[in-house]
Design a protein with these regions (language model features):
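Hydrophobic helix-and-loop "lid/oligomerization" segment in the mid-to-C-terminal part
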Residues: 1-128
């Protein structure tokens, strides 16, 4: 248990990201995280993505972590949503329940809008 402990500051950052997450269609959670001043920001983003799946009704989570001119997307899901297919839309990949992608030269806000638009399009097409 001691090895998996985290600092209070990192815990607060994760808690805020979870608390501020936006829910789409009642089952997709999207959170953002500014990676400045955080040790291992992409790891923290992945932890938030995992934590969001603990919320009742959430089938997939997407955490966008902004670091300099890059946005890292950590995607997680319960078996019925294939996040690999979603992340492939951005040149990323992974596995059915764990995937990721990177977006370059895009703001955190714009990256979130792109993810939301992609989810909307894929839902309308019946892909998710």
């Amino acid at each position: 248990r001691k090895m998996s402990r985290t600092s209070m500051e990192t815990y607060k950052i994760r808690a805020k990201a979870v608390s501020d997450a936006e829910i789409m269609y009642g089952s997709f959670a999207i959170a953002t995280l500014v990676g400045i001043g955080i040790d291992s920001p992409t790891v923290v983003g992945a932890q938030v993505a995992n934590e969001l799946l603990d919320i009742d009704g959430i089938k997939a989570s997407f955490v966008l972590t902004g670091v300099e001119e890059r946005v890292y997307v950590s995607a997680r899901s319960i078996d019925e949503v294939n996040v690999q297919k979603i992340m492939e839309q951005f040149g990323g990949g992974g596995h059915l329940t764990v995937a990721g992608a990177q977006m370059v030269d895009v703001s955190l806000y714009d990256a979130k809008q792109i993810i939301k638009g992609t989810l909307q399009f894929m839902k309308e097409e019946g892909d998710i």
